[in-house]
Design a protein with these regions (language model features):
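Non-catalytic accessory regions used for complex assembly or targeting
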Residues: 1-85, 91, 99, 107-126, ...
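Short loop/turn segments at strand-loop or loop-helix junctions that form parts
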Residues: 92-97, 174-175
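Short acidic, S/G/P-rich loop/turn micro-motifs used as interaction or catalytic elements
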Residues: 97-101, 157-159
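"Short basic amphipathic alpha-helical interaction patches in structured regions
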Residues: 105-112, 164-169
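Aromatic/basic-lined ligand-recognition segments
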Residues: 131-168, 183
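Solvent-exposed, flexible loop/coil residues
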Residues: 146-148, 177, 247
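Compact mixed alphabeta submodule
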Residues: 155-197
């Protein structure tokens, strides 16, 4: 059974876990908490050091077991997230066999959306009324168990976009309420955006991706930010979101 962890718990009990889990968490800590302070996501770095983040380990994302484990972890996380701190985020590490590690980035993207589709099918709670059903609406966000999440995916196939590279498949689920003070309408949010973009330019070997915009911006589509390309290519305006699980609901 998958378990939800705090950093403080993992620091004390890491050696009791499987080797790949030890390696994943260790490498995450080295990346986010690097001594040179280069990791571009400042809120994520703050959340790591303040123990606001929660962690989970699941199986290969291509299997049904991973979907079931992720569903249970997100249910548990939804019940405690607001008590973890202002930089809350759930970090999920996926077991990543060698054959998957060697896959092209397109395969990872396909598997990412397949996982979200299958995860939605496990959802027992109605889609929140305040979140649009259409992914192409600028206020759409992925939801599970009644909670809206901004999601980002990192993979071994991301090479140039170092900020999205990780030796295992890793997904971060950030509750939408985290951004109530951290958005384009607040001075704090504006300053943070400028700082993160500056750090991204120094960290990645490609420019800041053009899809990275604020939630609520009429030109923004959250789904395009979930899985970024390894280059500067932006999906065309006519591109359709791979998440189609809500199609029938939209027709009602």
């Amino acid at each position: 059974m998958a378990q939800l962890y705090a950093k403080s718990c993992l620091d004390q009990n890491l050696r009791s876990l499987e080797e790949w889990k030890q390696d994943a968490f260790t490498q995450f800590g080295e990346m986010v908490g690097d001594e040179a302070d280069t990791f571009p996501c400042v809120p994520g770095r703050q959340g790591f050091f303040l123990d606001h983040l929660r962690y989970g380990f699941v199986g290969d994302l291509r299997g049904d077991g991973a979907v079931n484990e992720l569903a249970e972890l997100l249910k548990e996380y939804q019940g405690c997230a607001k008590q973890t701190g202002q930089y809350a985020s759930f970090i999920c590490f996926f077991e990543t066999p060698q054959d998957l590690k060697e896959s092209p980035i397109e395969e990872f993207e396909q598997q990412f959306w397949s996982l979200l589709q299958r995860l939605h099918q496990k959802d027992e709670v109605p889609w929140p009324a305040e979140i649009p059903l259409d992914p192409h609406h600028h206020e759409w966000e992925y939801c599970f168990h009644g909670e809206a999440y901004f999601i980002l995916c990192s993979t071994p196939a991301h090479k140039l976009r170092k900020s999205r590279h990780f030796p295992y498949v890793m997904m971060a689920f950030q509750p939408r309420w985290v951004f109530e003070k951290l958005n384009g309408s607040t001075k704090f949010g504006q300053k943070m955006s400028q700082l993160v973009r500056k750090r991204l330019k120094a960290y990645d070997q490609v420019d800041v991706h053009p899809s990275l915009k604020w939630y609520g911006d009429p030109t923004n589509h959250e789904w395009k930010q979930y899985f970024l390309s390894d280059d500067e290519a932006e999906k065309p305006a006519s591109a359709k979101c791979p998440f189609t699980a809500l199609k029938n609901m939209m027709k009602l």
